[in-house]
Amino acid sequence: MTTRLGPALVLGVALCLGCGQPLPQVPERPFSVLWNVPSAHCKSRFGVHLPLNALGIIANRGQHFHGQNMTIFYKNQLGLYPYFGPKGTAHNGGIPQALPLDRHLALAAYQIHHSLRPGFAGPAVLDWEEWCPLWAGNWGRRRAYQAASWAWAQQVFPDLDPQEQLYKAYTGFEQAARALMEDTLRVAQALRPHGLWGFYHYPACGNGWHSMASNYTGRCHAATLARNTQLHWLWAASSALFPSIYLPPRLPPAHHQAFVRHRLEEAFRVALVGHLPVLAYVRLTHRRSGRFLSQDDLVQTIGVSAALGAAGVVLWGDLSLSSSEEECWHLHDYLVDTLGPYGINVTRAAMACSHQRCHGHGRCARRDPGQMEAFLHLWPDGSLGDWKSFSCHCYWGWAGPTCQEPRLGPKEAV
């Protein structure tokens, strides 16, 4: 179906969404599209205005990467994250056991206090990808953290035999990694309690594409599922989940929906620990080729996210998208012609379904997640569907099949 909308409808939807305003309501609105692209240079350097507000896309003032509607902290931007550089150089001790945690938390608190207003209520994403907090998750190039932990144990416990030293390395790493991640989230939430705090790419799924796999199902790897269950403490400490649904470069389009669906279903599974909103990260361009996502790619990422009941998506891109006037115009045209109209269609359909089926107190989600043709889309003439394939996931404070009953106490769903 076509999703192109007229200018009047675009403006009307933008006004009803309250675009560009602070967002304490993100967990309690049917679907949000957020902008995490450093596109400020398009306007300030090249005079190219990107009409994000008019397209219903939530962005920071001035379209800056960090701001009061959403922010992301990379490894060198919050506290003293320990990691090894490309040449093996240890930063902040290299491993969690070697980090002075109190110094890290003090610096993180200072940075949060000075970068986010007290009323901050948007997504706040920590992008720490160098190591996994579980020992078994550090394979491939991450084995360096196991080796460094063993060397640490040999130095700290020289009188133990090698097997006991290995045990100290394993337990010491996991305990320190947990303390680092948990305590960072606790400090952040104490300072900015309305923010949606969580780690990018968590939970993982392990359903990446391998070209030799002829029977690809999209299901998450069993070992990854087991590790996610072990990470119950991380979900309990988070206030939102930010899984990645970046499309793998060589994944055939026929498998896109299965890839995205299973990643989101795993996020919904672990989200039950704290009834957390799920905001999926979508990359605007294909890795390697740099091509913008096609209309069908948007359906299989943004559209599937909305249909499964995600709270929204975070659109991500790098500085190359605003590196020249030409690149800014390419981004502008893509926004106006493709991304913006589709985002408006899905956002408005999700809002209408919420009011039609859930009394405006919940979001619609597929009854059967595998029903691949069920989407929250408007018809080409802008009319609404009946959405019989969808049921309600109620917001905090509401219950019942159509979220019609006020409810006090713990969150029923988000």
Curated annotation (Swiss-Prot):
Which positions are catalytic residues? 129 (proton donor)
Sites where a glycan is attached: 69, 215
Catalysed reaction equations from the record: Random hydrolysis of (1->4)-linkages between N-acetyl-beta-D-glucosamine and D-glucuronate residues in hyaluronate
A molecular function GO annotation: hyalurononglucosaminidase activity
Q: Which Gene3D superfamilies match?
A: Aldolase class I
First and last residue of the signal peptide:
1-20
Question: Where does it reside?
Answer: Secreted; Cell membrane; Cytoplasmic vesicle, Secretory vesicle, Acrosome; Endoplasmic reticulum
Q: What processing steps or modifications follow its translation?
A: N-glycosylated.
Q: What is its main location?
A: secreted
* Disulfide linkage: 42-328, 205-220, 353-364, 358-392, 394-403
Q: What class of enzyme is it?
A: hydrolase
Its EC number is 3.2.1.35
- In this chain the EGF-like domain maps to 349-404
Single GO BP term: penetration of zona pellucida
Q: Which UniProt keywords apply?
A: Cell membrane, Cytoplasmic vesicle, Disulfide bond, EGF-like domain, Endoplasmic reticulum, Endosome, Fertilization, Glycoprotein, Glycosidase, Hydrolase, Membrane, Secreted, Signal
| Entry GO CC | acrosomal membrane; acrosomal vesicle; cytoplasmic vesicle; early endosome; endoplasmic reticulum; extracellular region; plasma membrane; sperm midpiece
What is known about what this protein does? Facilitates sperm penetration into the layer of cumulus cells surrounding the egg by digesting hyaluronic acid. Involved in induction of the acrosome reaction in the sperm. Involved in follicular atresia, the breakdown of immature ovarian follicles that are not selected to ovulate. Induces ovarian granulosa cell apoptosis, possibly via apoptotic signaling pathway involving CASP8 and CASP3 activation, and poly(ADP-ribose) polymerase (PARP) cleavage. Has no hyaluronidase activity in embryonic fibroblasts in vitro. Has no hyaluronidase activity in granulosa cells in vitro.
Family of this protein:
Belongs to the glycosyl hydrolase 56 family.
Q: What is this protein called?
A: Hyaluronidase-3
Originating gene: HYAL3
